[in-house]
Amino acid sequence: MFELPKLDYSNLALSPIMSEQTLDLHHGKHHQTYITNLNNFIKGSDYEKLSLEDIIKKSSNEKKAGIFNNASQHWNHNLFWKCMKPNGGGNVPSKLESKIKEDFGSFEKFREEFINAGVTQFGSGWCWLSLKEDKLVVTKSPNAENPIIHNMKPILLSLIHI
């Protein structure tokens, strides 16, 4: 069964970008609810033996909305919390920066494309930097959808909540 991951930082650590109240709501309530729902949906089923990524792929193809939405949001939030850090920002790891420049032409062009994807997402969703085959791509997705179901490997994401 799946569990809420412990954060690598305190609930105050992301202020002023994310308040303690907002972090508590998204981590302790929303994320926990996705996990509780997912565990309830898969208990006693073949899904119970699968990895989270395999549950996402299989439930997406089988049109199991309850399982898919909760599994995918659990996965999305897991990556989201890993993308956040106190006093965030700073330098991009050199290997990733080189790949961004190779695939987008410059870091500035990537940044512009990533921001544009985020601000043009209609309603709640996610903005992603993913590896598709051997190329970095920026995508956006509504609600629980994520690049895993499109055979991409997500690297970075931003939450868009309207």
What are the functions of these language-model segments?
Residues L12-L14:
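Secretory/endomembrane lumenal or extracellular ectodomains immediately following the signal peptide
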Residues D8, E133, P142:
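A broadly conserved detector of short glycine/acidic/proline-rich loop/turn motifs that flank catalytic sites
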Residues I160-I162:
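Conserved small/polar residues in nucleotide/adenosyl-binding loops
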Residues D8, G28, I35-N39:
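A long-range scaffold signal marking pre-active-site subdomains of enzyme folds
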Residues M1-S10:
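Acidic, low-complexity proline/glycine-rich segments
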Residues N40-K49, K58-A71, N76, F80-K132, ...:
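All-alpha RGS (Regulator of G-protein Signaling) helical domain and cognate RGS-like helical scaffolds
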Residues Y34-I35, W81:
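Alpha-helical and His/Cys-centered functional microenvironments
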Residues P16-T33, L52-W75, V119, N143-N146, ...:
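Alpha-helical scaffold segments that form or flank carboxylate-/histidine-based iron centers
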